[in-house]
Swiss-Prot record:
Effect of deleting the gene: Leads to light-independent conidiation, loss of sclerotial development and oxalic acid production, and reduced virulence on several host plants. Increases conidiation and melanin biosynthesis.
Residue ranges annotated for the Velvet domain, each copy included: 21-225
Domain characteristics, as noted in the entry: The C-terminal PEST domain is a region rich in proline, glutamic acid, serine and threonine residues that is required for the light-dependent regulation of development and secondary metabolism.
Role this protein plays: Component of the velvet transcription factor complex that controls sexual/asexual developmental ratio in response to light, promoting sexual development in the darkness while stimulating asexual sporulation under illumination. The velvet complex hat acts as a global regulator for secondary metabolite gene expression. Controls the expression of the oxalic acid and melanin gene clusters. Also controls the expression of proteases and carbohydrate-active enzymes. Involved in the resistance to oxidative stress. Required for full virulence.
Biased composition (Basic and acidic residues): 274-284
Gene encoding the protein: VEL1
Biological process per Gene Ontology, one example term: sporulation resulting in formation of a cellular spore
Ranges of compositional bias, category Polar residues: 294-308, 355-365, 385-402, 516-538
Protein name (record): Developmental and secondary metabolism regulator VEL1
Organism the protein comes from: Botryotinia fuckeliana (strain B05.10) (Noble rot fungus)
Subunit structure: Component of the heterotrimeric velvet complex composed of LAE1, VEL1 and VEL2; VEL1 acting as a bridging protein between LAE1 and VEL2.
Keyword Nucleus in annotation: yes
Location in or out of the cell: Nucleus; Cytoplasm
Length: 575
């Protein structure tokens, strides 16, 4: 079944007589007319951005042998000769000459491949076909294509009887007349008029026709354009005309629809805020989000705020290293009078109530303090919370020197039988020294523990005085004072040596009441390592041995030089 063919032009027919006595008839027909084209211009990019004439012109040639008028025979496939068709471009409407004599206008330029050889195809019919798939026009306008047929005979019997004269040569076009004498011009055929559009007005290339597909299927190089969805094949380099995508459709391919999500993400990426929280974006006058942790500082704990909603913060407590204001030293003086301790008989029942039940201390804990309560902050939070419960005998004394001693005295120096109520039980309640649980309890009720702490302070000398009774009768007076120092609080995990030296200074009145020896010995003399065996109950710290050593040292005049050497000289008064 023959493929459908577009509108044909009027066939052009010629007849010639060969030397062999045969009469040949040539029939030339344009079976596919050009319709539109896009002007490619004459600039530097004209060759890169060029569109072919659409659809590609196809010319059919048939040759008949009319030697016998009663029997016409087609000999296209059996005739031994070479044919080619040369295409030229002509203006469809002639331009009238003006009055002013001007130079002849330059002819329209046809670019591409204007020459086509004959292809012997079986479809749509058995004939010879000339295909022009690569013809382009540089300027826009109305044009026609002129096709000139040339033949190269191979056998002597097929040449013309009469040689070509000057008259016949003048009838040929200028392009055909310039051909070599070996080629014989046979005929000229013109196509229908078509329009060349500018780049802005060009409607686009149409889909390939059935004739173009039929020709391409038989091996001819024709660009096949399918539907719009298969027009982008820029990833395939090179290729056949039937497989390569049309360049114009690649240029006319519509851009993807505008995606607002992609554009918004691109803008955020350019502003370096892709992962930034929108709330953290601020202007020049807004507060930086990095200043917000100042509000959530450790001294503003949630447990203090509900109990003291209207209590103002004491001055100087915003930072841990700023000392308290002058009003803090006078704060203990405005405390309410201490309530009298309950009777000793109620002590066993008040102790569990302090730990588990809401006793009187719990009710007093809910009341806001009368004066500006000191807020424990910074590194000395635990020590500051304990230091505010001691009745200030000397308000100018530093509170950091007495923190660890009072805390450890709760658990080591106060016997349970000699105490009245149990308001100091919360100190033993927290063996792990939980800071968050201890601070709110002590900071809300300083008067509840002030009286009980007076008892602990008053009982400290009794503890120190009872210890020498259990010691050896040979112990010296200095060992008694040393035992008193040993009963001091044991160092904790955050115990500081400077604080330990300051806490020992609180026992100065206790050491003054105890009898002292006239000969004060150094630490190395008392705790020296024994070099001889001890027998008969002798001790390194015996009084007799110490007196002999002191007497011997005074007689020998032993002293240490600045360089560390020990000098031994007799005393000057004993010589």
């Amino acid at each position: 079944m023959a493929a459908s063919i577009g509108p044909k032009s009027i066939p052009e027919t010629i007849t010639r007589q060969t030397k062999g006595g045969r009469k040949l008839k040539y029939t030339l027909t344009v079976i596919q007319q050009p319709e539109r084209a896009r002007a490619c211009g004459s600039g530097a990019k004209s060759s890169a951005d060029r569109r072919p004439v659409d659809p590609p012109p196809v010319v059919q040639l048939r040759i008949y042998d009319e030697t016998d008028p009663r029997q016409e025979k087609e000999i296209t496939f059996h005739y031994n000769a070479n044919f080619f068709l040369f295409a030229t471009l002509e203006v469809a409407r002639n331009i009238a000459q003006g009055r002013v004599q001007t130079s002849a206008p330059q002819a329209p330029v046809l670019t591409g491949m204007p020459v086509s050889g004959m292809a012997y195809l079986d479809r749509p019919n058995e004939a010879g076909y000339f295909i022009f798939p690569d013809l382009s026009v540089r300027h826009e306008g109305q044009y026609k294509l002129s096709f000139n047929l040339y033949e190269e005979t191979k056998e002597e019997k097929d040449t013309d009887i009469e040689p070509s004269n000057d008259s016949s040569m003048r009838q040929m076009s200028s392009a055909a007349a310039a051909a070599e004498s070996s080629f014989d011009w046979r005929m000229e055929l013109k196509s229908d008029q078509f329009t060349v559009y500018s780049a802005k007005k060009f409607p686009g290339l149409s889909e390939s026709t059935d004739l173009s597909r039929t020709v391409a299927e038989q091996g001819c190089r024709v660009r096949i354009r399918r539907d719009v969805r298969m027009r982008r094949r820029d990833t395939k380099p090179g290729g056949d005309f039937g497989e390569k995508e049309d360049e114009y459709q690649q240029g006319r391919a519509t851009s993807p629809p505008f995606d607002y999500n992609i554009q918004a993400a691109r803008q955020r990426a350019l502003s370096a805020s892709v992962h930034e929280d929108p709330q953290q974006r601020r202007g020049s006058g807004e507060i930086s989000p990095y200043h917000s942790p100042v509000v959530n500082t450790p001294f503003r704990t949630p447990s203090i705020s509900p109990s003291t909603p209207n209590a103002p913060l004491p001055p100087g407590n915003q930072l841990g290293w700023i000392p308290n204001g002058p009003g803090y030293a006078a704060a203990p003086s405005i405390q309410p009078p201490h309530p009298p301790p309950p009777p000793p008989s109620s002590y066993p029942q008040s102790m569990p109530a302090t730990h588990h039940n809401q006793g009187p201390s719990t009710q007093f804990r809910q009341q806001p303090p009368q004066g500006p309560p000191p807020a424990p902050i910074g590194y000395d939070e635990r020590r500051s919370s304990y230091s505010q419960f001691r009745p200030p005998t000397n308000p100018s004394q530093q509170q950091s020197y007495e923190s660890d001693y009072r805390r450890m005295s709760f658990g080591y120096q106060i016997p349970a039988s000699s105490q009245g109520p149990q308001p100091i039980a919360p100190a033993v309640q927290n063996p792990a020294y939980n800071q968050q649980s201890m601070e709110p309890t002590y900071s809300r009720n300083p008067p509840a523990y002030s009286t009980s702490f007076q008892d602990s302070v008053a009982l400290a000398p009794l503890r120190a005085a009872e210890q020498p009774l259990a010691m050896s009768p040979l112990a010296s007076v200095t060992s008694i004072s040393r035992g008193t120092q040993n009963s001091a609080p044991m160092p904790s995990h955050n115990y500081n040596k400077l604080e330990r030296s300051g806490s020992y200074s609180q026992y100065a009145p206790i050491e003054a009441e105890a009898p002292k020896s006239t000969n004060k010995r150094s630490f190395n003399d008392v705790f020296s390592t024994p070099t001889e065996s001890l027998s008969n109950g002798r001790r390194p710290s015996a009084i007799g041995i110490d007196i002999e050593e002191n007497t011997r040292k005074q007689e020998q005049m032993i002293y240490r030089r600045a360089n560390g050497n020990i000098q031994n000289k007799p005393a000057p008064g004993l010589n």
